Amino acid sequence: MASNTDQASLEQEVRSLQAYANEYSQQFELLTQQLRFIESARGEALASTESLEAFSGLEGDVPTLLNLGGGISVHAIVTDTKKILVGIGAGITVEKPVEEAITFLHDRVTEMDASAKRLSESLGKLQEQMRAVEQRMQEIYSQTQHR
């Protein structure tokens, strides 16, 4: 009878471990998506910084291509190369000198780097937890095979 109780206990533990494994897998996917988003936004900010740095040395009317979205662009003339419109969040855009816009983007990249580091650390901890669950499930499997 103790054997039936042990078997039921192991089955319950396996179900619990499977639930943990599923939850950890979902968390891992979510964190991975967040990390990819941050990496994409970081790349965009760095590209914008490079463009602004090139822009800051220009004088007068500057011809450019303006991306309208959906793969559509138009030729445009930038008449003021000293002031840039910067989205600061929550749909708010402010006018800033180019140098301040560059600093703003550098600060944003620094914040994204810190967030990416935290996410990477969380992913590492989550992987450790997933390995522990997998190891315990292997132990249970081995126990049931040796009976």
From Swiss-Prot:
InterPro entries: PFD_alpha_archaea, Prefoldin, Prefoldin_subunit_alpha. One of its GO terms (cellular component) is prefoldin complex. It is found in: Cytoplasm. The keyword Electron transport does not apply. GO terms for biological process: protein folding. PANTHER family: PREFOLDIN SUBUNIT 5 (PTHR12674:SF2). Heterohexamer of two alpha and four beta subunits. Molecular chaperone capable of stabilizing a range of proteins. Seems to fulfill an ATP-independent, HSP70-like function in archaeal de novo protein folding. This is Prefoldin subunit alpha. It comes from Methanocorpusculum labreanum (strain ATCC 43576 / DSM 4855 / Z).
